[in-house]
Design a protein with these regions (language model features):
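Glycine-rich flexible loops
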Residues: 1-247
Length: 247
């Protein structure tokens, strides 16, 4: 019986998947959410032995399969895989060194959020869905080139503080999370928020949602992420398009 036929409850699909499958699922679903700037973008997932799974440099997120996933050590040295690791993995390495509580990191150039990052603005929160990720977003405005430089990567991680989402000025988005479910929530929501904010401001703008309401919604997400069906629903949609993506 296939995953699509099981009628699993919320959380059961993810539990049945390997970490490699989860990385593929995160890449595939976020590609459809707008993280689709060709072969750019990278995802790392910390494993129990403190090595990391990472997507290959050569493949786009929408063609990724579980057998394509690479493994690296905590210094970025490749341990397995037939493809190569992105030269820009330094940002991930420094994040994982500094924050052992964060098991997933991702970087991409989604269309709408990157537009706001290039305008040096954090998009306001005008709707409930945008509020789910809270106000926990920073703008890192010291970007001066590639984040493969160690000192620049460390500076970006320091600037993030306890935030889970950073807009890298003139560059893109960096997300860090405790789990793949939260990584999907933060990454998909910042792109949704960026698009909605642009649309609202194109209509003339309005008052943003009160900070207390935003924080309340954000805390609800953190406390109940295991009961949110959104990520697994997105995974099932990808499996309908490509039943072999976990091969």
């Amino acid at each position: 019986m296939s995953i699509l036929e099981r009628g699993l409850g919320v959380g059961e699909l993810l539990t049945s998947m390997s970490q490699r499958d989860q990385l593929v699922a995160l890449a595939r679903t976020l590609h459809r959410e707008g993280y689709n700037d060709h072969a750019t973008g990278h995802i790392t997932i910390r494993q129990p032995n403190n090595t990391f799974l990472v997507n290959p440099f050569e493949l786009t997120w929408d063609e990724l399969r579980s057998s394509d996933i690479l493994e690296m050590d905590d210094q970025g040295n490749q341990l397995s895989g037939k493809y190569s690791i992105t030269p820009a993995i330094t940002l991930h390495i420094e994040l994982h060194k500094a924050r052992h509580d964060l098991h997933v990191a991702l970087h991409g150039h989604p269309q709408w959020a990157t537009a706001w990052a290039s305008a040096l603005r954090i998009p306001p929160i005008y709707d409930q869905t945008s509020a789910l990720a809270g106000n926990n977003v920073v703008l890192y405005n010291a970007y001066g080139g590639s984040v493969d430089a160690v000192e620049q990567a460390r500076s970006a991680v320091l600037a993030m503080g306890t935030s889970h989402t950073a807009l890298l000025a003139h560059h893109g988005v960096f997300v860090a999370a405790e789990s793949v479910s939260l990584a999907y929530m933060w990454a998909s929501t910042i792109e949704w928020r960026a698009r909605r904010a642009w649309q609202v401001e194109a209509l003339g703008g309005t008052k943003s949602i009160d900070d207390k309401v935003v924080e309340s919604l954000h805390e609800f997400v953190i406390s109940n992420i295991s009961q949110f069906p959104t990520f697994e629903a997105a995974i099932r949609a990808e499996l309908r398009h490509d039943p072999n993506m976990f091969a």
